[in-house]
Amino acid sequence: MGYSYSEKKRIRKDFGKRPQVLNVPYLLTIQLDSFDKFIQKDPEGQQGLEAAFRSVFPIVSNNGYTELQYVDYRLEEPEFDVRECQIRGSTYAAGLRVKLRLVSYDKESSSRAVKDIKENEVYMGEIPLMTDNGTFVINGTERVIVSQLHRSPGVFFDSDKGKTHSSGKVLYNARIIPYRGSWLDFEFDPKDNLFARIDRRRKLPATIILRALGYTTEEILNLFFDKITFEISGDKLLMTLVPERLRGETASFDIEANGKVYVERGRRITARHIKALEKDNISQVVVPSEYILGKVASKDYVDLESGEIICPANGEISLETLAKLAQAGYTTIETLFTNDLDYGPYISETLRVDPTYDKTSALYEIYRMMRPGEPPTPESSEALFNNLFFSAERYDLSTVGRMKFNRSLAFPEGEGAGILSNEDIIAVMRKLIDIRNGRGEVDDIDHLGNRRIRSVGEMAENQFRIGLVRVERAVKERLSLGDLDAITPQDLINPKPISAAVKEFFGSSQLSQFMDQNNPLSEVTHKRRISALGPGGLTRERAGFEVRDVHNTHYGRLCPIETPEGPNIGLINSLSAFARTNDYGFLETPYRKVVDGQVTEEIEYLSAIDEANYIIAQANSNLDENNRFTDAFVTARGERGESGLYKPEDIHYMDVSTQQVVSVAAALIPFLEHDDANRALMGANMQRQAVPTLRADKPLVGTGMEKPIALDSGVAVVAKRGGTVQYVDASRIVIKVNEDETIAGEAGIDIYNLIKYTRSNQNTCINQIPCVNLGDPINRGEVLADGPSTDLGELALGQNIRVAFMPWNGYNFEDSMLVSERVVQQDRFTTIHIQELSCVARDTKLGSEEITADIPNVGESALSKLDESGIVYVGAEVKGGDILVGKVTPKGETQLTPEEKLLRAIFGEKASDVKDSSLRVPNGTSGTVIDVQVFTRDGVEKDKRALEIEEMQLREAKKDLTEELEILEAGLFARVRNLLISSGADAAQLDKLDRTKWLEQTIADEEKQNQLEQLAEQYEELRKEFEHKLEVKRKKIIKGDDLAPGVLKVVKVYLAVKRQIQPGDKMAGRHGNKGVISKINPVEDMPYDENGQPVEIVLNPLGVPSRMNIGQILETHLGLAAKGIGDQINTMLKQKQEVEKLRSYIQKAYDLLGNGSQKVDLSTFTDEEVLRLAGNLRKGLPVATPVFDGADEAEIKELLKLGGLPTSGQITLYDGRTGEKFERPVTVGYMYMLKLNHLVDDKMHARSTGSYSLVTQQPLGGKAQFGGQRFGEMEVWALEAYGAAYTLQEMLTVKSDDVNGRTKMYKNIVSGNQHMDPGTPESFNVIMKEIRSLGLNIELDEE
């Protein structure tokens, strides 16, 4: 495979040994596919909006004479595009129009004759739409709906593991979980009776459920027990023998037949005895009559003459009943077969505690349990029970639930409905009893075959259905009110409940989260996050250790590394790199199929359920050139995910990639295999907090995962079609599309507008920079412009920094870092932060607020940065406390004296009835105003500034559209010119004519004439579309804004701050090696090497051994080698050596070991391409060391040698202050360092006086509340230990909550008197009141 033009600019050397069989799939599939299914019409009506409509409609009136039917739906085009919605603070959504049909039937007619049909389209609220990047814009902010991992519907068998009862007895239970509807549980109690619960309410004997289904005692016993038949023959009692049932019992009598004793009394019956009995075909044995005593009758035995029941079903047989049965003429007696070992008498025992006796009494019992306090009637109790599990409206197992149910109970696949049947309930009870009897095992609820993913589409559909059901109730009421002649479907439907349900879900659900937009990786990870929390999921407090732990089914599905630290650990996971969900919502991972020990190219996705039956080899198994395993035994995962050694011919599948275990964030960590898991977790999490730097710098040591993440995140601009760059500037790129990719009759021009300096959710800066030049050939899918944190289409979260591992005067104690001043001077970690501040003018009771520059009691200097409308200029440098938007609010009328009233009447209104409520820059913030936006309510007059902004927007829109039109016209006329010249026209003559005249020419060739006419039509179309677009844009700009009720105007001011790195900022590497900057050191004081090159950061070597993240050391070595090669290339370029020398050196670097995936052949490159490549490699040769398949020690040494560096990776350094040599070589190299979004500027905070808590009167805490620092009990102990009594008294009284004391203190300080007069702290009064509230009077004696 060759490289394209832009790929040749910079090629990453790959150390991977194994070929890439499968590319990393598109990373946002889980979001986009799910939402597509929700919105796109499904002809079968199995999913999405269609399914929701079909499940609720038709709505039939109570009398059955009218019904409202659903026909179909359509989504309108959204009014504003994504960008406009973000600016305006509105939701990016499309209106939903549903075609409904109201059918009324003739009441008089005997057959259902249609009397009237009305059909019209009804508006049903708005559905938020997903942007191309898998996010939603809700009220102007980007949000992500996180997928949820919840328990799959179906049936689960579990046990309490002996924790419930003090005896430690294991109690088994079964639970049928539907997708929606009531849960049904069966459970054993310590006495081995079987109970049922509905919706986790009070338990009832399980046989009540069976009776409610209509079964009699005899039928219930028949369902669950085998029978033993006894025959009465004279005074003898014969038992029908099934030898297998006797295994393990002790014979209580001699088992003999035909005069031969098979088992003597008191002996244990073994398999040998059973064999002998079977061999001689013994079917009956004589038993003593005591043997039947205590056995349980399997049916009612009735005296046929008197009708009296001698022995009821489930009654015990005694000597008395035996005699009566013989007397009544019964020759055979059937009893239940039970034993203590593996056929327990559970159902029989349960029937004894069951208070009910027939179906009605059972239904009454269930009714009383579900609705205590209501008197049951036969109809209501029957209806309640049927609605619980047998009504499709109230109960649905769903296709997933039915599939899991059938698999668990070994029913045929694909059979059964969404509701339960009698057979289903009996099968569950049977399996539970089998498990109690020791046959079968309980399920593992943490197995990923029992947990499924619920994504956006499915959750949105459920919310939509909830809204529809609310509407259904209202419609039913309206339909039953009569007078349907005048009513149309439009009148019946109120869209409010639907839009409220949808809005609530997208706006405030626990799973609808504010998008983490620090950098492209954090966006991608957030969209691939899988949470076990949320509605219908777990809660943090209740989740135990097992749920949070890594399970062997996570392999290739959920990342074992990336999860938050803290209370959510293990509950929030990340999707593995190659994982996807299947139609049922279970996670699948890809494997290569293995046939007879040969690995094929065929790839199959397996879910955790399917995987259980296969043996799967690891991705790093050794293969020969025919893809056969070379080892006699291969490490593979077999039953239950346990790994072992297997023969090649026993293996069914093989892993696709070494990276398939981990998530994309963990796959970005080079040498992950050498890091401790805890540190790797921190590394994966901290990459998401990296702030995009001013100039992105690709990592020298990467993993090859950088490209897919940058492309899929959507922050970079990617070419939709191939072509040539025709125009490029900072804000737009124009591509002339290749002829073979254009559609007939279009201009063949693609225009990409770039995003410039906008604010992200985390206040970081989003800006796109073109990375192509005029005339560059472009292929489809290539990067045209880099976004934040991307460099030539590769993810670049930080900077490559020269580091040394050595102590330096205690400045790197406890993970601190010593940073060189050069890093600050070169702006390596300078970041731009954009803050949005808004000012709202409302209509108050006392009058409306006004935005104006005329503010009472404010000096001229404070207004110097405002224009005449009272709004700050763009470009103004502002600092804390400056006014950004002047605003005055009407004050309440104060009572005026008659004299004042007279003055008022004479001089007119004074400005004293308004107070200043201007928007000011918050304290501690400073920056430059980069943009101002004014939104004015419809019908409110726009101020001068708003009109100026409007005019500017109109100008820009017109300029943009005109430029676009010119580019498209140029493309069209070029085609016209070519057409005319090819038909024999003279080029010089044509150029003299006006271009529009070209279209009026005639050509003899009819086909060409048609083409010309087509182009003329296109030209007209272009002009028309231009006019139309301009008009639409003009209307949008001029139109008033849709603001919240009571709001007249909103002014948004954007401030940009450039933040350089400084002591107190938090930095980190990719291996969980985080630290705080302790000092910025002058360059001349930093340690330097023999060439006089100083290091940029000094790290503490003691941070490595105990943390066990050795990956950082290997990264440092490999980084040094990569930079060494870059330096060599740079020297050759400076010396202007011939291209061949350059080519062979670079070729040598690429050929050095590794490169399992793709060989780089520079002989196919032109000299110009080699030079351009060399130019991009000056700063270092970028290398990729894939996770679990990376560079080893020998390879790093080879690369160091090629770069002309010592293979130890250690260099002699000299002290920058004294010039002395350090006594031993130091590990120096290049590490990729990130600046995290924990900046000291955002954390620094100080308070003198401020707000106090209402009850305790103590200062509030935290920067947001402008709070104080808590002087806690340990600090109090410290002062006590020092005996600093007065200081302690001051801390606990006047500095805290002694209200009078602190007022006095304030006065004293003002008057220059340093005296303290402490009183009683307010919190003491609080505790006194609390004690009084307990009914104990407590008083302070003043003496």
Curated annotation (Swiss-Prot):
UniProt GO molecular function: DNA binding; DNA-directed RNA polymerase activity; ribonucleoside binding
EC number: 2.7.7.6
Gene Ontology, cellular component aspect: DNA-directed RNA polymerase complex
Domain of life: Bacteria
GO biological process, one term: DNA-templated transcription
Reactions performed catalytically: RNA(n) + a ribonucleoside 5'-triphosphate = RNA(n+1) + diphosphate
Keywords, alphabetical: DNA-directed RNA polymerase, Nucleotidyltransferase, Transcription, Transferase
Stored InterPro entries: DNA-dir_RNA_pol_bsu_external_1, DNA-dir_RNA_pol_su2, DNA-dir_RNAP_su2_dom, DNA-dir_RNAP_su2_hyb_sf, RNA_pol_bsu_bac, RNA_pol_bsu_CS, RNA_pol_bsu_protrusion, RNA_pol_Rpb2_2
Keyword Nucleotidyltransferase listed: yes
TM stretches of this protein: none
Enzyme class: transferase
Function statement: DNA-dependent RNA polymerase catalyzes the transcription of DNA into RNA using the four ribonucleoside triphosphates as substrates.
Family: Belongs to the RNA polymerase beta chain family.
Assembly and oligomerization: The RNAP catalytic core consists of 2 alpha, 1 beta, 1 beta' and 1 omega subunit. When a sigma factor is associated with the core the holoenzyme is formed, which can initiate transcription.
NCBIfam families referenced in this protein's UniProt entry, alphabetically: PRK00405.1, rpoB
Protein name, per record: DNA-directed RNA polymerase subunit beta
Organism: Haemophilus influenzae (strain PittEE)
Gene: rpoB
